[in-house]
């Protein structure tokens, strides 16, 4: 039984386009770029600056699950301590668990981060769709921000008496009466939700808030403390000579065609067997929560076992969703958001050809490279790696001649930030033979929800290349769940990064209070 439901890629794309009135005549007639924003800064194109990164943070604080450790509040405290002087915050997705519901925003987002919101001293008065940030806050959509809720309420309503109380009071699953409505809650919370405006007032709104120009393109003006909306689900901005590209990876994470095709294929049979095993594991954990929790409380901190079991159930659900995606993968063109990928290709090429740009940062939810135990092998991980690699190959082909003439060939991206995997990890790709070679990949997905372990297979990721297993990426730092029993460790993490005036522009500053062994500027 699946507790969550995810809309298809075409449904996600269409719904989000409607919400921002994508390419409405009022927008195109003004030659507005709906994928660009700008915010004012006193920094010059080569000045150093810092920014913060967090992700997978949206669990409840102070009640229900995690109420004893209050991870969201700890993250918020770190943000306040380390955020002084930061230019902006990047969020790698999954802002509100479990299903991105508008009902959960006050408890799972507004309360923990109220100090960064206008009127945050009275969080109860802040509506989730009326938030204004004091500091630039730039999120991307996570998978949980798109989820809906078809069966969970039926499950809970079918549980009676002490068992229902046990589930609700000890492991509060962070759900309300409905889900995200196909990402609508995120759109109302963070995007410029033009669909909700009267048609006759759209032009006035555009003339008031789309007043900036970047590379001769008219775009949204982001004003901290006044107007802090995003123009689209994927977008870009430039700060002190650094181009930041924020993607919606939920629309190009469909497992590759052929992975699940063929009713009698061995891979398909293996996945069916794995699915059955996962359902069995899930049933055992649900039983353990309901029937074995109270006796276990005599030997452990109250509720910790329930938290752990609920985290395992959530991980199993994500694995089940990934298997369903693999089994249903097809050859249809509508399973890939080609428009977004083409946009990224064109913007990267233009960025490299712009002498005013000194660095490039990419932000998305799903990590292309990761060694976290539940994510490294998933079809979605491999699909995002493939799609991003395909784009970077095209960019490399466009730029190759110019780079050869200049006698240099740098990585196409200075830094890639992601979440989804519940850990903090820094990887670097090697000579992959593609445009994604020699890039640092930072995963910041342990900012408040359950943490997970590194895979037992080790820190090196391999691919089959010309009949040989070749290492394509290696993990330089992994911080996640570790130990057992009294030695169990579940550190929450956020990341801070500082640019430097000399190339390469991005260097590690702090990582949740720790400094990586190697900075991103080193070869």
Question: Where in the sequence are the language-model features?
Answer:
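Core catalytic region of metal-dependent phosphoesterases/phosphodiesterases
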Residues: 69-164
């Amino acid at each position: 039984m699946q507790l969550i439901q995810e809309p298809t890629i075409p449904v996600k794309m269409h719904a989000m386009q409607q919400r921002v009135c994508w390419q409405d005549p009022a927008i195109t007639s003004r030659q507005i770029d709906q994928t660009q924003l700008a915010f004012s800064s006193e920094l010059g194109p080569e000045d150093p600056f810092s920014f913060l990164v967090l992700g997978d943070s949206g669990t409840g604080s102070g009640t229900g699950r995690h109420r004893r450790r209050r991870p969201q509040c700890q993250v918020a405290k770190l943000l306040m301590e380390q955020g002084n002087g930061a230019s902006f915050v990047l969020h790698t997705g999954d802002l509100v668990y479990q299903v991105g519901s508008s009902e959960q925003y006050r408890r799972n987002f507004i309360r923990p981060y109220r100090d960064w919101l206008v009127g945050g001293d009275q969080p109860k008065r802040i509506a989730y769709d009326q938030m204004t940030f004091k500091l630039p806050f730039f999120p991307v959509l996570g998978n949980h921000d798109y989820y809906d809720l078809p069966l969970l309420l039926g499950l809970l309503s079918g549980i009676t008496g002490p068992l229902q109380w046990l589930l609700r009071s000890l492991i509060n699953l962070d759900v309300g009466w409905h889900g995200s409505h196909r990402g609508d809650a995120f759109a109302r919370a963070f995007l410029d939700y033009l669909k909700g405006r009267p048609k006759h007032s759209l032009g006035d709104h555009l003339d008031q808030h789309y007043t900036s120009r970047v590379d001769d393109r008219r775009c949204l003006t982001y004003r901290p403390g006044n107007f802090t909306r995003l123009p689209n689900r994927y977008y870009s901005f430039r700060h002190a000579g650094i181009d930041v590209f924020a993607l919606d990876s939920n629309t190009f994470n469909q497992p590759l065609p052929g992975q699940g095709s063929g009713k009698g294929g061995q891979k398909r049979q293996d996945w069916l067997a794995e699915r059955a095993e996962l359902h069995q594991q899930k049933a055992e954990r649900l039983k353990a929560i309901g029937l074995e929790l109270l006796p276990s409380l005599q030997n452990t901190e109250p509720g910790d076992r329930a938290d752990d079991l609920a985290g395992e159930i959530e991980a199993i659900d994500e694995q089940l969703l990934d298997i369903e995606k693999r089994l249903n993968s097809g050859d249809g063109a509508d399973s890939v958001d080609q428009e977004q990928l083409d946009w990224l290709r064109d913007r990267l090429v233009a960025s490299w050809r712009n002498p005013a740009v000194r660095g490039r940062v990419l932000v998305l939810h799903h990590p292309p490279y990761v060694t976290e135990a539940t994510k490294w092998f998933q079809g979605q991980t491999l699909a995002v790696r493939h799609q991003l690699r395909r784009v970077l190959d095209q960019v490399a082909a466009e730029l190759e001649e110019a780079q050869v003439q200049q006698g240099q060939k740098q990585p196409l991206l200075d830094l890639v930030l992601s979440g989804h995997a519940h850990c903090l990890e820094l990887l670097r790709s090697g000579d992959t033979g593609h445009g994604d070679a020699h890039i640092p990949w930072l995963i910041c997905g342990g900012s408040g929800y359950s943490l997970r372990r590194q895979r037992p297979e080790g820190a090196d990721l391999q691919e089959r290349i010309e009949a040989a297993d070749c290492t394509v990426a290696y993990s330089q730092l992994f911080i996640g769940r570790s130990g057992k029993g009294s030695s169990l460790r579940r550190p929450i993490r956020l990341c801070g990064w500082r640019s430097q005036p000399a190339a390469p522009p991005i260097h590690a500053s702090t990582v949740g209070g720790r400094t990586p062994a190697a900075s991103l500027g080193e070869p």
